[in-house]
């Protein structure tokens, strides 16, 4: 690599300069404070783990996103975390071993082998919550409510929440007796919203008229809460699991909408985000003019099985950098500081420390520097007088 190119970062790898770093860190602190006020305990997970535990129960997508290397001490394969959720599940199942509901929150970098969206970062700063141990809908409602609370906190002018339930599609494919390959093919077509291809595939591979009707109507069932009533008519004679899923979606609308009347809840029964990972309610938050979800989550009830302790779970995660960039989160710049000219005077040092303890930002001069640089943002200077030290305006 030439000297000219040594400053280049790998594609998708980003750095945050002071203003952006301050914005992200300020938001991180605000969000973690909110999580803790809701009863979620902050945890810090390791950046690197054995892949045997890091990828357990997380699905093939996370495996492909994970950088792997060989541990020089054991010869085993290590992975750099691409998602903190499986680590939180390991903590819940093995490290903490608590009974009842267990609420955890986290914030930290993850690393991906490739961006998940076009021009996206391979080093997202993931922040999120996980609620373990509660199988009931109360947990899903709490997590969705917390996400809407967060979106309101960061100044999102209008909250758009896309909600689905993987149980609908799963029950229908089981009723149709699809093979794994057929199920995956239809899943991909639904995610692509390829109406013509869906119709062609269904009419070719599904012979029973009733089943054809279900699968052809599925991608059309999206909209406000009223679409759930229409879905009940469409799936009137479908497996009971479908009605259970629709009832859960209705309950979410009945509870969450009054809590957050300004939020727009959008139900999409063909939304299967994380289908191979989630087991029930799934959701994503969107901002006007942004095509990709700025936060997403859902229920995943089997992730703890591999750690010897199956626990129901639900949660959500977001990328702090994306939230800051998308929503232009406002953060107050640091207060102008006090500049202290270079000196080894013990009395000046004591005065500087007193100012810092009082909450002032004090920048000490170095070498022969007798005035602050512009980027140091100081509007006052510490000077020595006959009677002691004084802070004066610059």
Curated annotation (Swiss-Prot):
Gene3D superfamilies documented for this protein: Bira Bifunctional Protein, Domain 2
Entry keywords, A to Z: Amino-acid biosynthesis, Cytoplasm, Histidine biosynthesis
Protease among keywords: no
Pfam families: tRNA-synt_His
One Gene Ontology MF term: histidine-tRNA ligase activity
Predominant cellular place of this UniProt entry's protein: cytoplasm
Family stated for the protein in its record: Belongs to the class-II aminoacyl-tRNA synthetase family. HisZ subfamily.
Name this protein carries in UniProt: ATP phosphoribosyltransferase regulatory subunit
Native organism: Teredinibacter turnerae (strain ATCC 39867 / T7901)
